[in-house]
UniProtKB/Swiss-Prot annotation:
Its main location: cytoplasm. This is Trans-aconitate 2-methyltransferase. It is an enzyme of class 2 (transferase). Gene3D superfamilies: S-adenosyl-L-methionine-dependent methyltransferases, Vaccinia Virus protein VP39. GO terms for biological process: methylation. The lineage of its organism: Bacteria, Pseudomonadati, Pseudomonadota, Gammaproteobacteria, Enterobacterales. It comes from Shigella dysenteriae serotype 1 (strain Sd197). The keyword Metal-binding does not apply.
């Protein structure tokens, strides 16, 4: 996969950071020593962790060299490691694993989530936020355009669902707090929606296409967005963006 673009990702930095702020506010820990930020990206979520626990040893993990470089530049007091979340092993048990908008990219959550819980200290916390927009028009239309243009399905899998995650984490020995929030982001245009998803959800669909194929894909995608995202009275567009939040505290 081609590398992530930190500048494009940070174009909507405030909107992307807000769920991390709200997830962190629900973490029931006072003092922590060892923290991992899984899928840390350019370090915007890591900065929140460092602000709350400045004395903690915080390690950001990301598979993107560009994102890791950006994070290291922004936060020299934190450690950053280029690695696959599924294979990374901490040097010691963790007090907090924080994963903001990262685990949705990985398969087999029935194995992944218990594995992450096993990396925690007793009373340690796994805090997760994942976009839950597989059935939103933004993502449905990606699949429809791909089908029209004879491209294979390259999108991520849908999330397992609230009840499944509750059972997975309860059986792994956790107390579970789980909720879902839909944000309505004010967007100035359909092109702004495309700019948003190009940095994330559209990446798998576009990465192997030629420049001309990408343009055809995006032109058709823009046309279909016009049907699903009408203008408000003031000319803005409301982009519904559901997100699933989980705070699981290890009790065993």
């Amino acid at each position: 996969m081609s590398d992530w673009n930190p500048s494009l990702y940070l174009h909507f930095a405030a909107e992307r950071s807000r769920p991390a702020v709200e997830l962190l506010a629900r973490v029931p820990l006072e003092n922590v020593e060892y923290v991992a930020d899984l899928g840390c990206g350019p370090g915007n979520s890591t900065a929140l962790l460092h602000q709350r626990w400045p004395a903690a040893r915080i390690t950001g993990i990301d598979s993107s060299p560009a994102m890791i470089a950006e994070a290291r530049s922004a936060l020299p007091d934190c450690q950053f490691v280029e690695a696959d979340i599924r294979n990374w092993q901490p040097e010691q048990a963790l007090d907090l694993i924080f994963a903001n908008a990262s685990l949705q990219w990985l398969p087999d959550h029935y194995e992944l989530f218990p594995h992450l819980v096993s990396l925690l200290n007793p009373q340690g916390v796994l805090a997760v936020q994942m976009p839950d927009n597989w059935l939103e028009p933004t993502h449905v239309l990606m699949r429809e355009v791909a089908w029209e243009q004879n491209y294979s399905d390259r999108g991520r899998e849908p999330l397992a669902g609230v009840h499944a995650y509750y059972d997975i984490l309860s059986e792994a020995g956790c107390e579970v707090d789980i909720w879902r929030t839909t944000y309505y982001h004010q967007m100035p245009s359909r092109q702004a929606i495309i700019d948003w998803v190009t940095a994330t959800g559209l990446r798998p669909w576009l990465q192997d296409l030629t420049e001309s194929e990408q343009q055809l894909f995006l032109t058709r995608y823009h046309q279909m967005l016009e049907e699903q995202y009408p203008l408000q009275e003031n000319g803005q567009i409301l982009l519904a963006f559901p997100r699933l939040f989980i705070v699981a505290r290890r009790t065993e």
